[in-house]
């Protein structure tokens, strides 16, 4: 999860997020390169009193700096499209969980697992114990196995919400009357936090998401039923 | 009218609905609805022919996994009251 004053991306817990982090670094390097090139050129032109007559109305230069940006955009677009289509893959899921947004909590349905349904409310500050996280911890966590493709069906009962877990690279809108599907595979166990990411009213900031990802053997023992 | 209080299917080798190439998009509402319709059509057809409705169990499992429970309850209520919009 994010630590205080963090400005970078969270550590990846899914292959999709690993790809997204790599792409972020790739795009950022290109941005730095272009920014320094442009700033350097601006600096040179602003600090000189001379005029270069070869630069005025130079067709070759115009051609170069029209084609070169197009090539750079392609270099950014190709990996971006690849990741976009990767996130849409369903990958033969092993488990389907439904997440239903309400004002202002999430309901989860494990209908593949005995029909377990529960609500997930943020712990109010008065109920926090030492070690709990303010505005992030909930009364009932979503417990899921790692290394298994999981399908999330996300919808809403009242207004728009968005089910987002940054460390898994997930952000899917919860729209009333629409059933959005997303899949992920977690690669390491732990407790991961997310938050509603679509303004949904006064308590939009107070409907967190907590996923507890555990090894499959332990998940099969059934701790999910002891929530 | 068919009994819409479907029984819970027996425990078995069921995992979760597989990928359905008819519904490849992110929006799975048609997948949910289609399997709900297919289940009730299957029940209706096999009941009329006096055959076992066990093969209909697959459709039940799929829509039970994909559809939010509140949606299913609402549709079942509409079927009971004879005002369900879908064609079964």
Swiss-Prot record, chain A:
What EC number(s) are associated with this protein in UniProt? Answer: 7.1.1.9
Cellular component (GO) terms are: membrane; mitochondrial inner membrane; mitochondrial matrix; mitochondrial membrane; mitochondrion; respiratory chain complex IV
Catalytic activity, reaction form? 4 Fe(II)-[cytochrome c] + O2 + 8 H(+)(in) = 4 Fe(III)-[cytochrome c] + 2 H2O + 4 H(+)(out)
What effect on the protein does mutating residue 142 to M have, as reported in its record? In colorectal cancer
Record-annotated residues binding Cu cation A1?
161, 196, 200, 207
The answer to keyword DNA damage applying to this record is no
Highest taxon above the source species: Eukaryota
Supply the alphabetized keyword list. Answer: Copper, Disease variant, Electron transport, Magnesium, Membrane, Metal-binding, Mitochondrion, Mitochondrion inner membrane, Primary mitochondrial disease, Respiratory chain, Translocase, Transmembrane, Transmembrane helix, Transport
Instruction: Give the membrane topology.
Output: Multi-pass membrane protein
Positions in the Mitochondrial matrix compartment: 46-59
Q: Which cofactor does it need?
A: Cu cation
Q: Enumerate the Mitochondrial intermembrane topological stretches.
A: 1-14, 88-227
Q: Where in the cell is it found?
A: Mitochondrion inner membrane
Give residues annotated as binding Cu cation A2. Answer: 196, 198, 200, 204
The UniProt annotation places Mg(2+) binding at 198
Q: Name one GO molecular function term.
A: cytochrome-c oxidase activity
Q: Where are the transmembrane segments?
A: 15-45, 60-87
Q: Which Pfam families match?
A: COX2, COX2_TM
Task: Give the protein's biological function.
Answer: Component of the cytochrome c oxidase, the last enzyme in the mitochondrial electron transport chain which drives oxidative phosphorylation. The respiratory chain contains 3 multisubunit complexes succinate dehydrogenase (complex II, CII), ubiquinol-cytochrome c oxidoreductase (cytochrome b-c1 complex, complex III, CIII) and cytochrome c oxidase (complex IV, CIV), that cooperate to transfer electrons derived from NADH and succinate to molecular oxygen, creating an electrochemical gradient over the inner membrane that drives transmembrane transport and the ATP synthase.
Q: Which NCBIfam families match?
A: CoxB
Disease named in the record: Mitochondrial complex IV deficiency: A disorder of the mitochondrial respiratory chain with heterogeneous clinical manifestations, ranging from isolated myopathy to severe multisystem disease affecting several tissues and organs. Features include hypertrophic cardiomyopathy, hepatomegaly and liver dysfunction, hypotonia, muscle weakness, exercise intolerance, developmental delay, delayed motor development and intellectual disability. Some affected individuals manifest a fatal hypertrophic cardiomyopathy resulting in neonatal death. A subset of patients manifest Leigh syndrome.
Q: Which family does it belong to?
A: Belongs to the cytochrome c oxidase subunit 2 family.
Protein known as = Cytochrome c oxidase subunit 2
**Species of the source:** Homo sapiens
> Gene encoding it?
MT-CO2
From Swiss-Prot, chain B:
Give the highest taxon in the source lineage: Eukaryota
Where is region (Disordered) located? 1-22
Q: In which tissues is it expressed?
A: Testis specific. Weak expression in thymus and heart. Expressed in cancer cell lines.
* Presence of the UniProt keyword Disulfide bond in the record: yes
Q: Name one Pfam family in it.
A: COX6B
Q: How does it sit in the membrane?
A: Peripheral membrane protein
Which Cys residues form disulphide pairs?
32-67, 42-56
Motif Cx9C motif boundaries: 32-42
Q: Which UniProt keywords apply?
A: Disulfide bond, Membrane, Mitochondrion, Mitochondrion inner membrane
Q: What is its main location?
A: mitochondrion
Q: Where in the cell is it found?
A: Mitochondrion inner membrane
Can you cite a GO biological process for this protein?
oxidative phosphorylation
The UniProt entry's GO CC annotations, sorted and at most eight, read: mitochondrial crista; mitochondrial inner membrane; mitochondrion; respiratory chain complex IV
Function per UniProt: Component of the cytochrome c oxidase, the last enzyme in the mitochondrial electron transport chain which drives oxidative phosphorylation. The respiratory chain contains 3 multisubunit complexes succinate dehydrogenase (complex II, CII), ubiquinol-cytochrome c oxidoreductase (cytochrome b-c1 complex, complex III, CIII) and cytochrome c oxidase (complex IV, CIV), that cooperate to transfer electrons derived from NADH and succinate to molecular oxygen, creating an electrochemical gradient over the inner membrane that drives transmembrane transport and the ATP synthase.
User: Hey, which family's this protein in?
Assistant: Belongs to the cytochrome c oxidase subunit 6B family.
The protein's name in its UniProt record: Cytochrome c oxidase subunit 6B2
Naturally occurring in which organism (per UniProt): Homo sapiens (Human)
